[in-house]
Structures are given as structure tokens and as C-alpha cells.
Amino acid sequence: MAINAQEISALIKKQIENFQPNFDVTETGIVTYIGDGIARARGLDNAMSGELLEFENGAYGMAQNLESNDVGIIILGDFSAIREGDVVKRTGKIMEVPVGEALIGRVVNPLGQPVDGLGDIETTGFRPVETPAPGVMQRKSVSEPLQTGLKAIDALVPIGRGQRELIIGDRQTGKTSVAIDAILNQKGQDMICIYVAIGQKESTVRTQVETLRRYGALDYTIVVTASASQPSPLLFIAPYAGVAMAEEFMYQGKHVLIVYDDLSKQAVAYRELSLLLRRPPGREAYPGDVFYLHSRLLERSAKVSDDLGGGSITALPFIETQAGDISAYIATNVISITDGQIFLQENLFNSGIRPAIDAGSSVSRVGGSAQIKAMKKVAGTLRLDLASYRELEAFTQFGSDLDAATQAKLNRGRRTVEILKQPLHKPLPVEKQVVILYALTHGFLDDVPVDDILAFEEALYDYFDVHYNDLFETIRTTKDLPEEAALDAAIKAFKEYSNFKS
């Protein structure tokens, strides 16, 4: 049999063309140190900052320190099974979290894994946890209001969609309650809410989830939790995971409210990681880039331009102060990044003024342009009236002889303080807020005893719901006050019908 050299040559060439190598080339390193959620590995010379690394037991870590001899890695999750000498390999990817509609109504950890026992989450999309914030030309001015349902906020420190409004105060002053009420008030407002619990007790998170479920708010809310018992890398990454989930909706043209409860604990977790990674400590032992930690997070909240869909992320970051000290390092950092702050005071909270908002220290730098016309008209002088009342109240403690004008200011001030009180988990629609504040600023409450103010308010809403619902409807649809004569007549009719008189 003759051997045809050309046939053999063609056969070999075909085999070479069809050859599929079935081996995988990855850069690997060896773990040289493990402990406290931190690992060090040698041999990963080409690792990128923030790259996802995989340990041989299936655990993942993130490259943080790229040094000449080794790489400092923070471990995302349980690190008890990792040992010195284990192999760690590069993945070539940065950390991503699952995003999309399937997450709504679920409780997940910062890696996007469900922790509520309701089964797997079928998501198709992923977003990196670290992405650049929208640029200057990709943004739009804040112009739409975000109604929190709390009179003290919507009237005095209004928040707009796309704003960052810091909520700051000591522990146990009602910070979480303000945020939960704001989430409850988004029902039917076409908003998606994300509640990021950082370093909270698991029992506390469970309570908040049950509150959201009871009021039907879990239908439009995602809860991201990194509890106090979890390793500090998860506490550090949780807010970034939350805002990555929010960005998916924002770039679809939707509006998102995200609550970070609270960033003080994230800063503490980051300080812990930085010290373990041997980074040089600065003021209060925080690393030098702790400002950047929060600025790159909060800058991702924005109202984006119409070209990008016109969506928004509104952020309510929390900072916990010690003994009301708002000049502490982390507090001043976040105040300078955000568009205003709501300061909750312990002495107001303990004296029964809840929400315990200090109108003097609280400010909204951009929310005023988003406030509806009706609210602007009725709440315009409210802050000044409240400030002058506080001043007069302190002054009149030293003497009892007061002229009629001063006495009238004090009486109005006491009623203002009462009106701004609100029961827990009972946010008010904006039209009801406008009517009661109109009644207050136009003197209709001046002859109502202070102790009866809250009962008067409830009765007024019920009366208007039955007899003057068209006035509520006018405010709701036009965003402006109805005819003042009609509003005056309605309130007078209610006062004649009721018996709230001093």
C-alpha cells in the first residue's frame, strides 16, 4: 500500500486546527498569613487592586494591599477553613453583586445571597460594587420632592429625589424610625427602597423587616444586612453592594431611596481592616482615605440626566454621634459630603418631642427647590418662628412679666412644637400636612389648648376626609394651595362642629 505524504500532512494539519486545549492557566499564590478576616499571599504579582481572588476551599477574597512581597486580602465571608500554605488564585474579575427586580422583597447579605430562608433568587444581571459616580454632565438638578411623611422634615428640611441627606444623632434618638417612616411613605409613589443594615444586631434587623412586612413596604424594598456578628470585610462592602443594586434601577429611569444604617459602623470596620493590613493610622486611628471611603459611596447617589433615563438615587446615610458631638471626625466628613443634615437631639427625644429634630442645626441645602408650592407657602416662616420661640422660651425662664406680643409668640411656638410631633409609623400624605400647617400659621390653633392639639389634628383630618375631600384632592393634584377663602371656611366649619376651645 502506497503512503501518500500529502494526505498525511493534510490530516495532521486538520488535527492541529481542531485541537482544543483543555487546561486552564491562572496565576496562583500561596497564603502566608491568615487571621481576623485578613490573608496575605505571595506569588500574585499581577493582581489588580479590588480583584476577586479564590481560595482552594471555595472562599473568596478581595485584593486590597498590593505590596512588593505579597498581597493583602480581605476575606468575604467565613475564613475559618483557610490555612497557611493554601493556594489562592486570581479570577481576573472585580467583585460583583446580583441586581434586578428579583431582589425586591428579599433580605440578602452583601454578596447578594438570600438570608431570609425564602429560597434562591433568580437574578440575571450583575453589577460591580465599585463603579465611578455619574459625571457633572450626566447629572440634573434636584427638582422633584421625596415626601417622607414626617411634617418636621417635609416642612423644615425638605428632601428632593437625588439628594443626600445625613441623619445624625446619638444612639436611641429615633434615627432608624425616621428612615423606616420615610420608606413606609413611599407606598404607591413608584419608588424602590433599599435598607442597608451595617453592624446591627440580627434581632434588630428582624424587627425592622417585620415592620416593613406588616405595613406592606417589603413589596418595594430590598434589605441588605451585614450584622454585627459577621466579619468586618462584609460590613465594609455592604453599602457599596446596596448602591450597586440601586444603580441598576436608576439607569432604568426608576427612583430609588437608599438608607445606610449606619456609616459610623462601616468606618469602624474599615479602620479595623486598615490596621490589620498595616496601613498607617491617622486621626482617631482611621486611615488617611476614610473621607474617600464615604465620598465615593455617596457621590453615586444622584439625579441623572434625561439622556440616561432621568432616574435617581436618594441617600439617607446615618452617623451615630457621642454625646451630641457633631464636630467629630467621621461626622464632619459626612456633613461636608452630603447636601444637608437632620440632627436628632437626645434631650428633645427624652422630653417627648418625636421625631426629635433640632430645627436650628438641621438644614437641607438643595431640597427647598424640590418642595411643592403649597408647602412652601405654609411652611415659609415656620423655621424662623420655631427659632424665635426657642430663644424666647429660654429668655422667659428668668421673668414672668410679658407683653401681649411676646405671649402670643410663645403660645404659637408651643402649638408649633405640638403640631410637629408625630406618632411612630404613621407618615402623613403631603395634602394633610399642608392643611394642618395652614391652620397653624393662620392662627386657627391659637385658641385650642396645647394638650388638645394632637386630638384636634386627628379630628380635622377625619372631618376633611368626609366633608372637604375635594380640598385634599386639589392640593394633591395641583401641588398648590386651594382658594384661601375656601380653606378658611372649611377650617372654621370644623371648629364650629368640634368643641376644641380653651
UniProtKB/Swiss-Prot annotation:
Species of the source: Streptococcus pyogenes serotype M18 (strain MGAS8232)
Q: Name the residues annotated as site: Required for activity.
A: 362
> Record keywords: NAD included?
no
Specify the superkingdom. Answer: Bacteria
- The residues the record assigns to binding ATP are 169-176
Alphabetized CDD domains for the sequence: ATP-synt_F1_alpha_C (cd18113), ATP-synt_F1_alpha_N (cd18116), F1-ATPase_alpha_CD (cd01132)
Q: Which reaction is recorded as catalysed by this protein?
A: ATP + H2O + 4 H(+)(in) = ADP + phosphate + 5 H(+)(out)
Alphabetically sorted, this entry's keywords are: ATP synthesis, ATP-binding, Cell membrane, CF(1), Hydrogen ion transport, Ion transport, Membrane, Nucleotide-binding, Translocase, Transport
Q: Which family does it belong to?
A: Belongs to the ATPase alpha/beta chains family.
- Subunit composition? F-type ATPases have 2 components, CF(1) - the catalytic core - and CF(0) - the membrane proton channel. CF(1) has five subunits: alpha(3), beta(3), gamma(1), delta(1), epsilon(1). CF(0) has three main subunits: a(1), b(2) and c(9-12). The alpha and beta chains form an alternating ring which encloses part of the gamma chain. CF(1) is attached to CF(0) by a central stalk formed by the gamma and epsilon chains, while a peripheral stalk is formed by the delta and b chains.
Function description:
Produces ATP from ADP in the presence of a proton gradient across the membrane. The alpha chain is a regulatory subunit.
Localization per Swiss-Prot or TrEMBL: Cell membrane
Instruction: Write down the EC number.
Output: 7.1.2.2
Membrane topology per record: Peripheral membrane protein
Q: What is its main location?
A: membrane
Provide the protein name. ATP synthase subunit alpha
Which Pfam families does this entry report, sorted A to Z?
A: ATP-synt_ab (PF00006), ATP-synt_ab_C (PF00306), ATP-synt_ab_N (PF02874)
Is the Amino-acid biosynthesis keyword given for this protein? no
In its UniProt record, a GO molecular function of this protein is: ATP binding
Q: Mind telling me which NCBIfam families this protein's record contains?
A: atpA, PRK13343.1
Q: Which SUPFAM superfamilies match?
A: C-terminal domain of alpha and beta subunits of F1 ATP synthase, N-terminal domain of alpha and beta subunits of F1 ATP synthase, P-loop containing nucleoside triphosphate hydrolases
